Amino acid sequence: MHEIYLIGLGNPGKKYYNSRHNIGFLLLEKLSKKYNSNFLLKDKLKSSCSEFQINNYTFRLFLPNTFMNNSGYAVRAIVDWYKVNLDQIFIIVDDKDLPLGKIRFRRKGSSGGHNGLKSIIEQLQSQNFKRIRIGIGSPPLIKGENNFNTISHVLGNISLEEKLILDKVFKRVIESLEHLNTKKEDHIINELNSFNQD
């Protein structure tokens, strides 16, 4: 039985539930619900966890409860507990440097300034894990200044218009993840990176 570990990044709690920074949580909750699997809190993994099978693959889903900037502690706990090879891990994360609705699947790379990815890299001492980045668009400029209002943007709630776009994105990503056992990874990477929600 093959095992796939999907880790969505976000912040726990109602205050942050529908924020742009919680894209990873929202996508994995949608996937878990599709397979009638509930998330259960596991303190030793510092995460809420869900598990189900698709054909001969076991999908294990995790929502860290460490808050975004400490995501690496949860990922480290998951890797240590399950003795996971890093190539089995997929991190689902928001990206303010991508236009809303764009997807980027990479097998490895730097944090790109994302604190959740930075924490994971620090804890794993490696950049060699897969990540699916979902664009939330650039933050607006602060009126009268040359600075971007990044914190308000990433922690702000997803609007109805954004949700309509992200629903299409989530559907595309979920369909690709479901075919990890039938399609070559290169094909899935090309599918996601060329996705256009229009």
Swiss-Prot record:
CDD domains assigned: PTH (cd00462)
Residue numbers binding tRNA: 16, 67, 69, 115
Entry superkingdom: Bacteria
Keyword 4Fe-4S part of the UniProt annotation: no
Cellular component per GO, a single term: cytoplasm
Reactions it catalyzes: an N-acyl-L-alpha-aminoacyl-tRNA + H2O = an N-acyl-L-amino acid + a tRNA + H(+)
Coiled-coil region list: none
Pfam families: Pept_tRNA_hydro (PF01195)
Subcellular location(s) per record: Cytoplasm
InterPro entries: Pept_tRNA_hydro, Pept_tRNA_hydro_CS, Pept_tRNA_hydro_sf
UniProt xrefs under HAMAP family: Pept_tRNA_hydro_bact (MF_00083)
Protein name (database record): Peptidyl-tRNA hydrolase
UniProt source species: Prochlorococcus marinus (strain MIT 9301)
Lineage of source species: Bacteria, Bacillati, Cyanobacteriota, Cyanophyceae, Synechococcales
